[in-house]
A protein has these predicted regions:
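PRPP-associated nucleotide enzymes
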Residues: 1-194
Length: 194
């Protein structure tokens, strides 16, 4: 099954995942659009279809382990591991005192080939933090898989990177944000503080 860009966007819109307002994103930048992938992840069949489509781009890369940052990367890592094979493990990183860490007795074995996955990227900072953890454990990052790249393709991770959908949604530094200048309160919907 090949999923078309228009079909993906339509499903995200139908699920209420494309939200309008004034948002302070996890990366600290502001935007008038927020993509809440949890609204799509509550539909396992569609999530499986999305991850199957993305997973096709990594078949043959001999992946041992998939790692995603909490919260959005947890479900995605699990589904991607199921798509890529019965022996592919799935784990996640999470924040502890504001720092991305590997907990819950999860291990990355030396030399393991790792695919890092994320639901939405804007600046790529969470993915880079996960990549740093993998490298610090002597794992080898062989790729990055992203459902939605909202940077318009500007983020470069230095490894094979596949995105299911690339959109260019305007972001602003807080001091340059037109919504802040109008006095519109910003909502912080992300999971960085969790």
């Amino acid at each position: 099954m090949i999923i078309k860009t228009e079909e993906v966007m339509k499903k995200f819109e139908e699920a209420g995942a494309i939200q309008k307002g004034h948002f302070k994103l996890t990366s600290g930048v502001h935007s008038d659009t927020y993509i809440q992938c949890a609204q799509v992840m509550q539909h396992p069949g569609f999530m499986h279809n999305l991850c199957s489509e993305l997973g096709k781009k990594f078949r043959g890369d001999d992946i041992d382990l998939i790692v995603g940052p909490a919260i959005g990367g947890i479900i995605m890592a699990h589904v991607m591991a199921r798509v890529l094979g019965p022996w592919v493990r799935a784990i996640f990183t999470e924040r502890e005192n504001g720092k991305m860490t590997l907990r819950r007795s999860f291990e990355i074995n030396q030399g393991e080939k790792v695919l890092v996955v994320e639901d939405v990227t804007t600046t790529g900072s969470s993915v880079r933090e996960v990549m740093d953890i993998v490298k610090s454990r002597q794992g080898k990052v062989v790729g990055v898989g992203v459902l939605i790249d909202r940077s318009g393709g500007k983020v470069n991770f230095g490894v094979k990177t596949e995105k299911l959908l690339t959109v260019d949604i305007k972001t602003y530094l807080p001091e340059e944000c037109p919504l802040c200048k109008k006095g519109v309160p910003a909502i912080k919907p992300g999971s960085r503080e969790l």
